[in-house]
């Protein structure tokens, strides 16, 4: 008979405990600073361009290179987390992206900056899957969607912090110490998340599901990657999940990669005002992430995905195609910018869906690879926007996000409904 877990698993508890909230808090903070470090560059792109004399194509390449690096980071750190543990690898990813941010502050040209952004991308790529795997493996099935959504709110809050740093702190530092030190100072500040590693190492427990799975593992088992790719059902789920993540992330990065610049240069907003518009969007995003989890636990993952994708598309088409008309009615402008953020709440679906369709043995590997390969494809997003903008304007390029959002809302129905599915040691 197969040995049984030595004790009750955390995900078998009736209600969340202090340990659950500790895991959630650390994973959430790691994701917040992960997304902050990823997005900060977009809010500093104008002073960086002036300081280093970079072209638009070079800036697009830098954004794309960072996203491509996340793909490699997701695969490598996902495999490491299945091998060495979620807690350990979560710490590694935070140290890596914090190091990348620090080094960006010393950059002297495009090549140097590219290397620094690659380092940032590697760490960023590994953090999400590890944090969501921890939450998915430790929280009870009936409330997994809600708490995965709470972790996901780190993304809009991270962008909000980046918008404040880029829109207000950068000008203040530039005025005080000179233009060169505005954006550099912002990157130096961004090394602070490394302190989070101390708290994780001292206070956060390892996933008990992973520990039990490791205890039961045999030397004869095939590698995680081989098992994932040679098992027909898992391979199909991985590919379908990869397409879902790719279309959704295309919608996301077509929205955000040039949105601050669109607001600043093409709509005549000041950097501070552009930052305020982004804060409106991220307020909607935070509410969207939280409410998505409730809807997903109530009506199912697929229904929630479709609803939020449609809302996202409506908001995007309004602010890119009809901004001139909206400008006459400030309340409508606020509403549709808010809807853009609200629709991105479907990002909260990745964690529970991917946690529930993949077994413990390959969960972190599969989640990290699917999520970050999809994000790596976004290397082409800023390049496509730049190309489309030459004919249809920057708003026309960004509006492509609406079409990808609608595709996502339809494609999610190719995956099974997993609401309420239990996560055990050996499988799903």
For the regions a protein language model found, what residue spans apply to each?
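C-terminal ends and interior cores of transmembrane alpha-helices
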Residues: 95-108, 311-326
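Conserved MFS/SLC helix-loop-helix module at the cytosolic interface between two early adjacent transmembrane helices
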Residues: 73-108, 299
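Cytosolic juxtamembrane N-terminal segment immediately preceding the first transmembrane helix
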Residues: 1-36
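Central cavity-lining transmembrane alpha-helices of secondary-active solute carriers
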Residues: 64-77, 279-291
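Extracytoplasmic gate region of multi-pass secondary transporters
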Residues: 41-42, 234-286
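Glycine-rich segments within core transmembrane alpha-helices of 12-TM secondary carriers
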Residues: 145-170, 193, 371-381
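Cytoplasmic helix-loop-helix junction between adjacent transmembrane helices
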Residues: 116-153
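Helix-breaking motifs and short loop linkers at transmembrane-helix boundaries and internal kinks
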Residues: 53, 85, 106-112, 140, ...
């Amino acid at each position: 008979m197969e040995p049984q877990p030595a004790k009750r698993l955390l995900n078998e508890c009736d209600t969340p405990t202090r340990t659950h909230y500790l895991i959630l808090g650390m994973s959430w903070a790691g994701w917040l600073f992960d997304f902050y470090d990823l997005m900060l560059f977009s809010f500093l792109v104008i002073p960086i361009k002036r300081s280093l004399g970079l072209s638009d194509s070079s800036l697009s390449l830098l954004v794309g290179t960072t996203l491509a690096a996340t793909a490699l980071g997701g695969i490598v750190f996902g495999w490491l987390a299945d091998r060495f543990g979620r807690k350990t690898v979560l710490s590694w990813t935070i140290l890596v992206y914090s190091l990348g941010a620090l080094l960006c502050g010393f950059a002297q040209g495009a090549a140097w900056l590219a290397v620094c952004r690659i380092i940032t991308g590697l760490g960023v790529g590994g953090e999400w899957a590890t944090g969501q795997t921890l939450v998915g493996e430790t929280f009870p099935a009936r409330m997994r969607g809600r708490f995965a959504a709470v972790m996901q709110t780190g993304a809009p809050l991270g962008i909000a912090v980046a918008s404040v740093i880029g829109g207000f702190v950068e000008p203040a530092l530039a005025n005080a110490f000179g233009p060169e030190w505005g954006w550099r100072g912002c990157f130096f500040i961004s090394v602070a998340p490394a302190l989070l590693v101390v708290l994780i190492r001292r206070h956060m427990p390892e996933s008990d599901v992973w520990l039990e799975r490791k205890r039961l593992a045999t030397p004869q088992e095939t590698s995680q990657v081989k098992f994932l790719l040679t098992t027909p059902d898992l391979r199909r789920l991985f590919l379908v999940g990869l397409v879902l993540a790719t279309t959704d992330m295309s919608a996301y990065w077509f929205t955000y990669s040039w949105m601050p610049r669109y607001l600043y240069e093409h709509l005549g907003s000041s950097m501070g005002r552009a930052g305020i518009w982004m804060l409106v969007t991220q307020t909607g995003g935070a509410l969207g992430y939280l409410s998505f989890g409730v809807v997903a636990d109530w009506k199912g993952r697929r229904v929630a995905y479709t609803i939020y994708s449609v809302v996202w598309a409506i908001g995007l088409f309004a602010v890119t195609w009809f901004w001139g008309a909206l400008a006459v009615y400030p309340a409508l402008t606020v509403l549709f910018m808010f809807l853009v953020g609200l629709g991105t709440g479907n990002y909260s679906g990745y964690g529970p869906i991917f946690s529930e369709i993949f077994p413990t043995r390959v969960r972190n590997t599969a989640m990290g690879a699917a999520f970050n390969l999809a994000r790596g494809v976004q290397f082409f997003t800023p390049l496509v926007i730049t190309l489309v903008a030459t004919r249809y304007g920057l708003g026309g390029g960004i509006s492509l996000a609406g079409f990808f959002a609608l595709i996502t809302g339809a494609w999610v129905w190719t995956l099974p409904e997993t609401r309420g599915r239990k996560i055990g040691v050996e499988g799903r």
